[in-house]
Design a protein with these regions (language model features):
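A structural signal for well-ordered alpha-helical scaffolds and beta->alpha junctions
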Residues: 44, 69, 151, 209, ...
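Short substrate-entry loop that stabilizes the transition state in hydrolases
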Residues: 120-135, 140-178
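Alpha/beta-hydrolase active-site loop
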Residues: 172, 178-226
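Bacterial N-terminal signal peptides that target proteins for export
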Residues: 2-13
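Divalent metal-coordination and catalytic microenvironments
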Residues: 76, 158, 216
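Sec-dependent N-terminal signal peptides
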Residues: 12-20
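Domain-level recognition of soluble alpha/beta enzyme cores
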Residues: 28-138
Length: 226
């Protein structure tokens, strides 16, 4: 029988993630307002944008549909102008849908992590970038079952000190991601634990690492065209 998230290690990771978001949000709402979390120490304001890019040169190996191309949810953080009086972006993209979906996937009530949806970042969506300076670019790649914004605090600290950071959810290898229509895509959804073990044995070392490299290369090539 095939169940969603049969990978027990991933279940533990996601459960800890939900508990962490829940705990941080509850503690934060009592000890300090969620919109006044200490900002990064650098001198630059932080802008961020989310994109959905499709690599039409690569078929999606995680699905059996031959017309399915590799689609990535991408986020960029960059030094920006102003930003002090603008509404900050949520810590997790699509927080309500993301947290409720993960909660249900690990067997918790859908509204369990609702406090986590209140967490905000120190970035402002769509803020005007600084164009008269040059900044080093950092590529961030999450771990197995991770998320592109799992290290948002560290990313924002870097950006506030003059870096640009770009990251993507490695689709089907991230715990959760979204397509351009806002539909959720889970970690190897509908693959049983036995099937996952065989899948990992066949593909993980040789294919998955190379596929991640191709994801990041695609980000760089697309970024040049933006």
């Amino acid at each position: 029988m095939s169940f969603l998230y049969q990978n027990n290690t991933l279940k533990i990771f996601l459960s800890l993630l939900i508990f962490a978001l829940q705990g941080c949000a509850v503690a934060g709402s009592v000890l300090v307002p969620l919109d006044s979390i200490e900002p990064p120490k650098g001198r630059y304001s932080i802008g961020t944008k989310v994109y959905f890019w499709t690599d039409t040169s690569r078929s999606e190996v995680y699905t059996t549909d031959p017309s399915d191309f590799r689609e990535l949810m991408v986020q960029i953080w960059y030094p920006a102008k102003g930003g002090n009086n603008y509404q900050k972006a949520p810590h997790v993209t699509f927080p309500d849908k993301a947290i409720s979906t993960i909660s249900k996937a690990v067997g918790l009530p859908a509204n369990f992590g609702k406090h986590g949806t209140q967490l905000v970042s120190n970035s402002v969506g769509g803020l005007e970038p600084i164009n008269n300076e040059t900044f080093p670019l950092i590529l961030f790649s999450h771990g197995d079952g991770g998320l592109l914004n799992q290290n948002t605090s560290q990313v924002e600290e870097l950006v506030s000190n003059g870096y640009i950071v770009i990251a993507c959810n490695h689709t089907y290898n991230a715990s959760i991601t979204f397509d351009k229509d806002g539909n959720t895509i889970l970690y190897k959804s509908n693959i049983s634990w036995r099937e996952q073990a065989q899948y990992h044995k066949k593909y993980y070392t040789n294919m998955l690492i190379n596929y991640r490299y191709q994801d990041l290369s695609f980000l760089l090539e697309t970024l040049k065209q933006e």
